[in-house]
Amino acid sequence: MSIKTEEISALIKQQLANYNEELAVEEVGTVTYVGDGIARAHGLENALSSELLEFSNGSYGVAQNLETNDVGIIILGEYENIREGDQVKRTGRIMEVPVGDALIGRVVNPLGQPVDGRGEIKTDKTRPIEKKAPGVMARQSVSEPLQTGLKAIDALVPIGRGQRELIIGDRKTGKTSVAIDTIINQKGQDMICIYVAIGQKESTVRTQVETLRRYGAMDYTIVVEAGPSQPAPLLYIAPYAGAAMGEEFMYNGKHVLIVYDDLSKQAAAYREISLLLRRPPGREAYPGDIFYLHSRLLERAAKLSDELGGGSMTALPIIETQAGDISAYIPTNVISITDGQIFLESDLFYSGTRPAIDAGSSVSRVGGAAQTKAMKKVSGTLRLDLSSYRELEAFTQFGSDLDAATQAKLNRGKRTVEVLKQPLHKPLPFEQQTVILYALTHGFIDDVPVDDIMRYESGLNDYLESNAKDLMDEIRQTTKLPDTDKLDAAIKAFTEGFVPEQAADDKDSDK
């Protein structure tokens, strides 16, 4: 057998030509310090700001401080298994969270991992947690109402889809309850809700989730939970993770409501991180970019232009004050970023006025344009009536001689306060709110005893749904007031037949 050297050499040349050695080049650094959710690494000279980094044990971190010799890293999750000398490598991407319909009805942590014990979340979509907010030309003005179901808000401080409305007040004044009631009221409104719990007790979050589930609100709600026992970096990124999940729906033409409960705790977590990273402290030891922390988050809420699908994301950030001081550093920052605030007052709360909304300090800067015509008509003089009542109430403490006009204003004011009260987790449909406020502002309730107002309201709604359903349907469908003569006649008929509780008791005792 003869060996053909030409064939062998051709075969070797062909194999050499096809040989391709793939080299994986990675920039790797070494951990020089770790503790309190923070790590420092040497050797990552080309790392980018906010880049996702991977530790040798599989944990992840985010590059925060880019210094001459070191990179300051916040560790996402547990840091106990990371040691000095461990390797850390660049990934070339920024942090992303899973998004999409699969998250609806679930409770997740800020990394998008389920914490409700109901199995894994099957979605292949992800979004970066940091994203540039829509520009001026990508937005349109707020024009659609977002009904909270709370008379005091929908009448006095209306909210529109795409608005940022701050809920502010001392601890235990009902801030979370306002947000939860608003989420419950979105049932059937084609709205996806996201509740971001930042630093809230695990037991409290469990209670809120059970409440949402009981009222069927988890069918359209995602809960993002970062508990107080978790490292500060997770509390810091939680609102951005929630915003990324909301943007997935917003950019697909859907409407989103996102609640940040609360941003005071996120600011405290960011202060902790910044001090550990040895950034220069400023006022109240917060870093210099604390304003940017909240502005870049809240600016992501918007009503998109029709060219981009017309979707919206409405933000309800919550801020906790100390002794009602809304002029403190973080409260004034967030007030200046948002489109209005709902101020909840301790004195009102403890006196039984719930929701404890202070009409004088609460304002909505853009929601008025989104308010329905019916609500605008019936609530026109409400704020003025309420503020004049507060003044007269203070004045009457010094004397009891009042003329008839002043007494009438006081009587109307007492009934206004009573009408605006609402039981917990009982949001009212828009048409029922409109009718009771119409009855109030047109004097139908002036002779109803204050203690019977809630019973009167409930009875009036039942009566109109049974005997004047066409009027209620008209308000519901057109969002305008129907024929006022018919409405007056229906309310008058019910009012004349309404028996106050005291009178009913007297009749029973006579028998």
Swiss-Prot record:
Compartments it resides in: Cell membrane
Major site of localization recorded for this protein: membrane
CDD domains given in the database record: ATP-synt_F1_alpha_C, ATP-synt_F1_alpha_N, F1-ATPase_alpha_CD
Sorted UniProt keywords: ATP synthesis, ATP-binding, Cell membrane, CF(1), Hydrogen ion transport, Ion transport, Membrane, Nucleotide-binding, Translocase, Transport
Any Pfam family hit: ATP-synt_ab
Gene3D superfamilies in UniProt: 2.40.30.20, ATP synthase alpha/beta chain, C-terminal domain (1.20.150.20), P-loop containing nucleotide triphosphate hydrolases (3.40.50.300)
GO molecular function ontology, one term from the record: ADP binding
EC number in record: 7.1.2.2
GO cellular component, one term: proton-transporting ATP synthase complex
SUPFAM superfamilies hit by this protein: C-terminal domain of alpha and beta subunits of F1 ATP synthase, N-terminal domain of alpha and beta subunits of F1 ATP synthase, P-loop containing nucleoside triphosphate hydrolases
Catalysed reaction equations from the record: ATP + H2O + 4 H(+)(in) = ADP + phosphate + 5 H(+)(out)
Membrane topology type: Peripheral membrane protein
Positions with a binding annotation for ATP: G169, D170, R171, K172, T173, G174, K175, T176
Annotated site, Required for activity, chain positions: S362
Family: Belongs to the ATPase alpha/beta chains family.
Task of the protein: Produces ATP from ADP in the presence of a proton gradient across the membrane. The alpha chain is a regulatory subunit.
Quaternary structure (record): F-type ATPases have 2 components, CF(1) - the catalytic core - and CF(0) - the membrane proton channel. CF(1) has five subunits: alpha(3), beta(3), gamma(1), delta(1), epsilon(1). CF(0) has three main subunits: a(1), b(2) and c(9-12). The alpha and beta chains form an alternating ring which encloses part of the gamma chain. CF(1) is attached to CF(0) by a central stalk formed by the gamma and epsilon chains, while a peripheral stalk is formed by the delta and b chains.
Protein name: ATP synthase subunit alpha
Provenance organism: Latilactobacillus sakei subsp. sakei (strain 23K) (Lactobacillus sakei subsp. sakei)
